[in-house]
Structure formats: C-alpha cells, structure tokens
C-alpha cells in the first residue's frame, strides 16, 4: 500500500491564461446543417431511384410509342397508296354542268343569295325604336304648330344619340369580314380543283 507521504503536497495547476475556452455552436446553425444533410440524403436517394428505375421505364415507353407511330404511319401510307390505285379519275373538262347526278361539280361557286345570315345584333331593334320616336315627335310638332325649346333640345339630343349609335355600329365591319371569309373559302375550293374529280 502506498503511503500518503509519497504524493506531492502541492500540485502545479496550469494558469488560467493557457486554458482555451470552448465556444459553443449555435443551435440554429446545427439545425440548418442537419436539415441540409437530411435533404441531401433524400435528394440523392430520389435521384438514384429516378436514374435506375423511372428513366429506363420512360425511355422504353417512349420507344414503344415511337415504334407504334411509325408502324401506323407506314400502314396508312400503304392503305392510301392502294386506294389511289383503285381510284379512277375523270377530267373536269369532259363533264358538263351537272349532267350526271353521281358527280359533284366542285368548281360551282355558291351564290351570295344562298347564304343564310343570322342577325344576332340588337341594333335593328334600337333603330326601329328610334324611328318610332322620331315619328311620334314629328306628329306632336305638327299637332302643336310650333315646337317649343324643350322639344328642339330633345330632338338635338336624339340626333346626338343617333350619331353615336351609327359610330358604334359594326355591322358593316362584320359584313365585310363575312364576305372576306366567303372569298377565302372560294379560293380554297379553287385550290382543290386540280382538273380531276373522282368517279
């Protein structure tokens, strides 16, 4: 057994200047680091799953759709070629104007009289009401002899309203657009008339 006298009585403790203080880390920084670390691990796992399983499956499906589209296109071309071989053509010049009922005369243009125009505008009703008001005012003026100042002012206001209605009326623009559409349809019909019609 070691005696008590063998231990030194005075211990030389280090000075406080040589002791380095440990700085504690901020808990917010630790939380952010942990969140980023966990997020990186999750993203890496998702990337692995997508690269190993999802991407090959999508590539296979895309290739299958591409092959199917190519197969359908080739079959359609073959069917169209076979139908064109069976189609008998007759020149338009050999046909008269509606000589046979089993032919369609594609070069016949539609007349403007056959076009049914639906007037969904409310301007006609407004113009009709204004004309009725004008007739009533004229009758009142004739019956009273001389129009009063209030009637003249009212007639002036009616003329202003009529002018505003005429300025906002777009029926002519719509009519011009419909005519342009008809002309465009006729031009398209002319493009398809290439000198041959099916028989």
Swiss-Prot record:
Q: What does this protein do?
A: Component of the peroxisomal translocation machinery with PEX13 and PEX14. Interacts indirectly with the PTS1 receptor (PAS10/PEX5) and directly binds to PEX14. Required for import of both PTS1 and PTS2 proteins.
Q: Where in the cell is it found?
A: Peroxisome membrane
Gene name, Swiss-Prot/TrEMBL: PEX17
Provide GO CC annotations from the record: peroxisomal importomer complex; peroxisomal membrane; transmembrane transporter complex
Query: What more is known?
Result: Present with 656 molecules/cell in log phase SD medium.
Species of the source: Saccharomyces cerevisiae (strain ATCC 204508 / S288c)
This one is known as: Peroxisomal membrane protein PEX17
Enumerate the UniProt keywords alphabetically: Membrane, Peroxisome, Protein transport, Transport
Topology of the protein relative to the lipid bilayer: Peripheral membrane protein
> What is one process in the GO biological process aspect for this record?
protein import into peroxisome matrix, docking
């Amino acid at each position: 057994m070691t005696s008590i006298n063998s231990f030194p009585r005075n211990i030389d403790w280090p000075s406080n200047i040589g002791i380095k203080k440990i700085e504690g880390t901020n808990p917010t920084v630790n939380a952010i680091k942990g969140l980023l670390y966990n997020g990186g691990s999750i993203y890496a796992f998702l990337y692995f799953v997508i690269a190993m399983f999802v991407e090959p499956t999508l590539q296979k499906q895309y290739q299958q759709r591409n092959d199917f589209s190519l197969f359908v296109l080739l079959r359609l071309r073959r069917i169209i070629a076979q139908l064109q071989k069976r189609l008998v053509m007759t020149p338009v010049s050999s046909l008269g104007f509606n000589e046979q009922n089993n032919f369609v005369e594609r070069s016949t243009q539609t007349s403007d009289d056959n076009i049914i125009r639906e007037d969904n505008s409310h301007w006609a009703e407004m113009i009709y009401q204004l004309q009725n008001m004008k007739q009533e005012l004229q009758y009142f003026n004739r019956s009273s002899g001389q129009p009063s100042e209030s009637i003249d002012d009212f007639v002036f206001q009616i003329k202003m309203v009529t002018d505003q209605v005429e300025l906002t009326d777009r029926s002519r623009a719509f009519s011009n657009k419909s005519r342009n559409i008809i002309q465009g349809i006729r031009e398209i019909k002319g493009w398809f008339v290439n000198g041959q019609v099916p028989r």
